[in-house]
Regions:
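Regulatory, non-catalytic segments
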Residues: 2-186
Length: 186
């Protein structure tokens, strides 16, 4: 219950950054996978997404690369965030995201998904002096007006790197069905 209270406090703080002119700030979150009226509730930015990402504590686990996140429900509809720190980084001015041992927190508004996320694609663009990155997990919480609070933990425990196994710059986790027949990878 205390964790939910903290998440709601973070969500209120993130939504308080909307300019007084009534315009939404520029955002890096968008609909993915051909989201339609049945898969996404409205096209306004009414839901609040809070994302916790734990970087591994092993040697050279941190990265300077750009990290993107896609989330989808079992029906394949969802959202994609192209630059997590720019979209909703909450760690403060000058914080180095995705560094060894960090628990980085991001929160921002986005279109509401009709169903909770159960599929995730985490990707690195491989740029920067230290492109390799070891991610322990991604935890996502989604809530919105007249909606419950959906929470999903995606265990990653994988390098996103071209020089370490599995030699991929992305990790896909599909928890949509027990038989592994959930959302197809992008």
């Amino acid at each position: 219950m205390a964790k939910l209270a903290v998440l709601l406090l973070l969500a209120v703080a993130a939504s308080a950054t909307v300019p007084a002119q009534g315009r939404d700030p520029p955002t890096q979150i968008k609909l993915i996978r051909g989201a339609d009226a049945s898969g996404v509730v409205g096209d306004s930015m009414e839901c609040v997404y809070t994302v916790f990402i734990r970087t591994g504590s092993i040697w050279k686990a941190g990265t300077d690369a750009n990290i993107t996140l896609q989330l989808a429900a079992a029906d394949g509809n969802g959202v994609g965030i192209s630059d997590l720190p720019a979209w909703g980084g909450l760690m403060g001015q000058g914080h180095a995201y995705f560094e060894r041992g960090n628990l980085d927190i991001f929160s921002g508004r986005g279109p509401c998904m009709a169903k909770p996320p159960c599929w995730m694609r985490l990707a690195s663009d491989g740029t920067g002096a230290h492109h390799g990155w070891y991610c322990n997990y991604v935890e996502v919480t989604v809530t919105g007006p007249h909606k419950g609070c959906a929470q999903q933990l995606f265990t990653v425990e994988q390098w996103l790197a071209t020089d370490a196994a599995p030699y991929q710059l992305e990790a896909v986790r599909d928890l949509c069905s027990g038989g592994g027949e959930g959302v197809a990878a992008a």
